[in-house]
């Protein structure tokens, strides 16, 4: 693939995506979902998050018949972010799957939908592939771009393709060193993620991180159990990710109730809206919300307010003057919430 055969643009927000057609034609759209709204291409679309795309494969597994169809020279491919599924989807559209093992793409789809904590379920050679990729993508020069405008990322995607050519030994015997680097990275990353831990109970773990992905760190060495939920605040991207290990929490529903319809993801893993800057206050609000949801999945009661309310997750702005006091009372990370026999919630 030559870098200018097509143009690949990263469009990070819904607002920009709604305007993009005024600047260029979106011939193909891959992972262009922004909460509850999606941009679709004039020739090709590969989305799979929203209910309207239920049952659709991830971009990395979307069938593409390049024998009878291909993008024209100079076509524009639009993406909303750069991750493994997105990159593989672009590669498929460009006819670059021929050296990628089908098994790798199948697992990439599963991981994208269910979270990377499931990687241990797959054979050792598959774990080696993914650890090599994660190690490479964690290098400063390869980290995902954080942009606020429509950005040409053609050269960046080309660099990913070159990495996969090396990993899967297309041109030279470079795979063994990459595999070994991945194994070393995987060994080191567990210690590093634990150093980012803010607090934990047997049910959830909370992390503050900068670069290290902590969303799959369910296992607690302290409790010797697998927590149900991980909440991770990334200070580099000013974003929050919520993931669930057992399906007991709908992460996508949670983040959308916290931050509105532009937040998105899957039931098993979801995050704050792209382009939205969140802070530690929002992290604590997320933790507090999960505590309440664990006690009352449908009815929410504010411990700092007399009476009940059906919490719409925006009441701190519009309805409840006691909400900030309520949130601040949970700022002490060791605090817990207990439901009394009367049904009242009490902060301990």
Q: Predicted segment positions?
A:
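Conserved catalytic core of nucleotide polymerization and phosphodiester-bond processing enzymes
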Residues: 1
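Short hydrophobic beta-strand segments
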Residues: 4-10, 25-31, 72-81, 206-208
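A short, well-structured beta->alpha microelement
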Residues: 5-24, 58-65
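Intrinsic-disorder/low-complexity, polar/charged segments
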Residues: 10-16, 82-84, 152, 304-311
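Gly/His-enriched, cation/cofactor- and phosphate-binding structural elements
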Residues: 17-42, 48, 166-348
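Short alpha-helices
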Residues: 49-154
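Exposed alpha-helical structural elements
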Residues: 106-109, 118-121, 125, 162, ...
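Hydrophobic, aromatic-enriched interface-forming segments
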Residues: 122-197
């Amino acid at each position: 693939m030559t870098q200018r055969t097509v143009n690949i643009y990263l469009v990070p927000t819904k607002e920009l995506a709604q305007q993009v057609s005024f600047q260029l034609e979106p011939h193909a759209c891959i992972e262009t979902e922004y909460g509850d709204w999606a941009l679709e291409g004039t020739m090709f679309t590969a989305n799979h998050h929203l209910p309207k795309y239920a049952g659709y494969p991830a971009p990395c597994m979307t069938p593409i018949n390049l024998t009878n169809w291909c993008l024209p020279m100079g076509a524009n491919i639009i993406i909303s972010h750069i991750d493994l599924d997105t990159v593989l989807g672009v590669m498929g559209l460009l006819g670059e799957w021929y050296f990628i093992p089908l098994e790798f793409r199948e697992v990439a789809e599963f991981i994208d939908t269910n979270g990377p904590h499931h990687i241990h379920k797959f054979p050792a050679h598959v774990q080696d592939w993914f650890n090599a990729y994660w190690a490479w993508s964690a290098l400063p020069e390869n980290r995902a771009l954080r942009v606020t405008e429509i950005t040409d990322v053609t050269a960046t995607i080309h660099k990913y393709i070159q990495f996969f050519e090396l990993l899967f030994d297309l041109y030279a015997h470079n795979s063994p060193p990459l595999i070994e680097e991945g194994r070393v990275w995987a060994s080191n990353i567990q210690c590093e993620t634990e150093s980012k831990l803010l607090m934990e109970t047997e049910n959830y773990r909370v992390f503050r991180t900068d670069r290290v992905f902590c969303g799959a760190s369910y296992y607690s060495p302290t409790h010797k159990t697998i927590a149900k939920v991980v909440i991770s605040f990334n200070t580099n991207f000013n974003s929050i990710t919520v993931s669930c290990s057992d399906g007991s929490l709908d992460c996508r529903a949670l983040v959308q109730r916290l931050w509105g319809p532009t937040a998105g993801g899957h039931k098993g893993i979801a995050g704050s809206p792209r382009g939205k800057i969140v802070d530690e206050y929002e992290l604590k609000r997320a933790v507090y919300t999960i505590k309440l949801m664990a006690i009352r999945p449908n009815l929410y009661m504010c411990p700092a307010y007399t009476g009940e309310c059906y919490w719409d997750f925006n009441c701190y702005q519009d309805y409840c003057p006691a909400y900030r006091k309520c949130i601040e009372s949970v700022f002490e990370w060791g605090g817990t919430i207990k439901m009394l026999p009367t049904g009242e919630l009490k902060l301990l």
